[in-house]
Amino acid sequence: MMTSNILSRFLPPNGSPSVYETIRQHDNHSDASDVEERAGMAFEDEHGDRFSDRELEDALADAGRDDSPGPSEPFLPRSPPTKRDEGGFLKAGSRRRKFSRSGRIHAASPRHKFDDSDDDVPPSLLVEGDQDDDDVLRSKLPPPPRSIDPPNVEPPPRPSPRDDRVHWEAARDRLPLHDTNRRAHHASLWSAGYPNLALVDPKEKALWMWANVENLDNFLKEVYTYFLGNGIWSILLNRVLSLLTFAFVVGFSIFLTNCIDYHKVRGSRTLDDILIQKCTKQMSMSATFLLWLLSFFWIGKAFQYLLDIRRLKHMHDFYHYLLGISDAEIQSISWQEVVSRLMTLRDSNPATAGAVSAKHRKFMGSQSKQRMDAHDIANRLMRKENYLIALINKDILDLTLPIPFLRNRQLFSRTLEWNINLCIMDYVFNEQGQVRTLFLKDTHRRALSEGLRRRFMFAGIMNIFVAPFIVVYFMMHYFFRYFNEYKKNPSQIGSRQYTPLAEWKFREFNELWHLFERRVNMSYPFASRYVDQFPKDKMVQFAGFVAFVSGALASVLALASVVDPELFLGFEITHDRTVLFYLGVFGSIWAVAQGLVPEETNVFDPEYALLEVINFTHYFPGHWKGRLHSDDVRKDFAVLYQMKIVIFLEEILSMIFTPFILWFSLPKCSDRLIDFFREFTVHVDGMGYLCSFAVFDFKKGTNVISQGDTGRRDAARQDLRADYFSTKDGKMLASYYGFLDNYGANPRSGHPSTKRQFHPPPTFPTLGSPSAIEMGNFGDRPAAAGLMGQQSTYGAAPRFGPAGMGDHLSPAPSMLLDPHHQPSASGFRSTHRANPYPRYRASRPPPTISDPIEDEDPPAGKGRSAVKSSPGVGSSGGGIGTSDSNLGESWRMNLVGDEVEEEDEGGENVDTLAGGGGVLGLIQQFQKVNQDNRGRTTVGI
């Protein structure tokens, strides 16, 4: 009875089909050529058209009635023989659905003429396929009737389903209505044209493979993986070394645990005295089974790597011959340049066999480009990752530990991340990498949710069996890798890094891994600076005392060993513990304690360091605002930035706690997960189904990111709806700005880039750095510009002018975006950020310390004019302010937008004259300051 109750939790109830069977049937019944169903990625020629049994029955009946040619048949036009080119390929193609369409029309109207060549595409515009397929079919079909059948002729009786099956088999043998082996046919043509692939020009072969790409997502992932691997030889070397590392860890661990007699170590002098002869024969059954299991795994990986060499060679040829990038150059070239060359290759080869279906080839034939610019490539590469970023940002996943004293603590490790991808992503996405359309309908919500719960349960059970082996391997690997490093530099034991959960919180939509890694790595010096200098006076005093005592003892022992090394090094201070042993112990204690004591010359300013971290990580929760100095913020940041040894211990413990999270925590949010994929998935023609947050509307710019229905009367309902359908902490806005920073600049159009450059952290804040009140306590985002906060006037021209403001080489603002993705003039004007912190913009320049103003949203008209009036109005910064008094009221400040509005009433716009910046703009600004303010307000330079 207990066994049946346990199984009933994992098995579906009686009489209801499995959710996997429903998904499989839905995928099989989906029309392969439907853009909405198959996301525009299906290739119709692979699947063929579906003919009903009635149509085939009518065709067979017509063929049986009139097998001999009619009196008028000799006068019918005959189709010419199929022509082939020199390579053995058919010259042109035609659509195969025309026969089924004409068959239906012919059955409904016998007077319909068979010739519908007016709907055909001219042969000169066709790219590939069989040109005369329809002519061949017409030659094999009976001639069309010349008169209407007599009205007294009764239709033949409908046969039984068994007869329908017989007719279907006969029709498939007699009438080649569809070539079911089209891919094999192309392979035979290729083999006939090129009998020996080794003799084919590698460039021609690479072009042929590029033209026959069927799954663009997988192909671009291979391109990106090859780019990250730095070429074929680096990838092969990495794989060989990984296999050798795995073999060494397993072999050395077995040697240490089974081949040494540790009882004989104390009295032995040589290694042979403690070795166990033929130790493998004396191993236990569990150790033997584990060794065989790991050996088979190693052999399987080696065999997989050998088979993958052919694919790597093809990718090498693609990079070398089509993109013009060698293995030596790939290590230093940027991804933006690779994207640019991919777009150039796409333009020179407009059609691929797998990306455009036969049904839409006529429409795509008039288009010179496909959906494959920087935005589309990022969406294809991060189709799944964008969903996971949104899930973590919106706190959909319940990652709390189901333990009474740890219920408020979240656990997210690499092991749990792998299980989430296995349980959720592999469940939602099909084999082609597209979202299953069944998840986009609310009709199967309950069944899909129950299926997801069962996947969590099953994954938890599997983790119980796999966890012991993984724990042992990772512990040995970590010990072998980091012990020598900690031995040489004991202070490294306190080094920190971001946790896996912090990385997913920091990562932005459509941000590839290497770009994210570069951005986060630049924040490490400032993060360490913040953690090290935060108030910890008690610990510093205690560490100083320990360092003093241990250093004194170590120095005395070291001095004695220098005086008489032969006698003193063998001297035992305690039983079997010599001076050399205690010298190592005291030296290690001194190094660790000294690492906890900060430098005496450090200036205490944790808010400044944390603001620098925020400028790189783009993570600034709302409850941190105005509280950067508090201990609560320090604790929140310490959870995201932990010591490496703690992260490793959490990884080991997560293998024990992951089953409990999969059993008790994640099943609670299965309904929300199914609703999330249904409500935050949009369809893009030619791209498929994407996360709605990852589809940037460049034409509207940042205006579209301010989500929420402003037309509703119920404010509470409006706020709830806006919060539900928007991201937290400005994630989408930061992603939009980050994407423009990475891909928006056109190096050939003369637009300067404002991407934040990395500089090592100074030992103390400079005099030009803003105060904590100025940067941390006011504004919606950290305000920083210029050097450390004052907006620099040099180079203050807007990064992007209106469309067409570039030089004559390329008027487009970005070379890596197609015309339909080019931001409009207003969209670019809204992204004028002439400071090195381009992603966070306050609604006003930073106030002075004595200006206790509150955050308020400016009117739409004023905010828009402020953005258009001066490039200096940005996230934060100094800008040009005017004082109403020269003496006691210098704390009052007018916004640049208000000042420009007043000038527009009686004079010309300065921005119009100066063109948004440059020397003329600087002169005009200095003249304005000297005339109106008598030189008291400064221009941040």
UniProtKB/Swiss-Prot annotation:
Cellular component, GO annotation: autophagosome; cytoplasmic vesicle membrane; endoplasmic reticulum membrane; Golgi membrane; mitochondrion; phagophore; phagophore assembly site membrane
Topology, Cytoplasmic side: 1-239, 308-455, 477-541, 599-644, 666-941
Catalysed reactions listed for this entry: a 1,2-diacyl-sn-glycero-3-phosphocholine(in) = a 1,2-diacyl-sn-glycero-3-phosphocholine(out); a 1,2-diacyl-sn-glycero-3-phospho-L-serine(in) = a 1,2-diacyl-sn-glycero-3-phospho-L-serine(out); a 1,2-diacyl-sn-glycero-3-phosphoethanolamine(in) = a 1,2-diacyl-sn-glycero-3-phosphoethanolamine(out); a 1,2-diacyl-sn-glycero-3-phospho-(1D-myo-inositol-3-phosphate)(in) = a 1,2-diacyl-sn-glycero-3-phospho-(1D-myo-inositol-3-phosphate)(out)
Membrane topology: Multi-pass membrane protein
Position of the signal peptide: none
Annotated Pro residues bias: 71-80, 141-159
TM segment ranges: 240-260, 287-307, 542-562, 578-598
Subcellular location: Preautophagosomal structure membrane; Cytoplasmic vesicle membrane; Golgi apparatus membrane; Endoplasmic reticulum membrane
Post-translation changes: Phosphorylated by atg1. Atg1 phosphorylation is required for preautophagosome elongation.
Superkingdom classification of source: Eukaryota
InterPro entries attached to this UniProt entry: Autophagy-rel_prot_9
GO biological process: mitophagy; piecemeal microautophagy of the nucleus; protein localization to phagophore assembly site; reticulophagy
Basic residues bias (residue ranges): 93-104
Lumenal side: 261-286, 563-577
Compositional bias (Basic and acidic residues): 23-54
Keywords recorded for this protein, A-Z: Autophagy, Cytoplasmic vesicle, Endoplasmic reticulum, Golgi apparatus, Lipid transport, Membrane, Phosphoprotein, Transmembrane, Transmembrane helix, Transport
Function: Phospholipid scramblase involved in autophagy and cytoplasm to vacuole transport (Cvt) vesicle formation. Cycles between the preautophagosomal structure/phagophore assembly site (PAS) and the cytoplasmic vesicle pool and supplies membrane for the growing autophagosome. Lipid scramblase activity plays a key role in preautophagosomal structure/phagophore assembly by distributing the phospholipids that arrive through atg2 from the cytoplasmic to the luminal leaflet of the bilayer, thereby driving autophagosomal membrane expansion. Required for mitophagy.
Family, similarity comment: Belongs to the ATG9 family.
Subunit description: Homotrimer; forms a homotrimer with a central pore that forms a path between the two membrane leaflets.
Comment field on protein domains: Forms a homotrimer with a solvated central pore, which is connected laterally to the cytosol through the cavity within each protomer. Acts as a lipid scramblase that uses its central pore to function: the central pore opens laterally to accommodate lipid headgroups, thereby enabling lipid flipping and redistribution of lipids added to the outer leaflet of atg9-containing vesicles, thereby enabling growth into autophagosomes.
Identification of the protein by name: Autophagy-related protein 9
Phylogenetic placement of the source organism: Eukaryota, Fungi, Dikarya, Ascomycota, Pezizomycotina
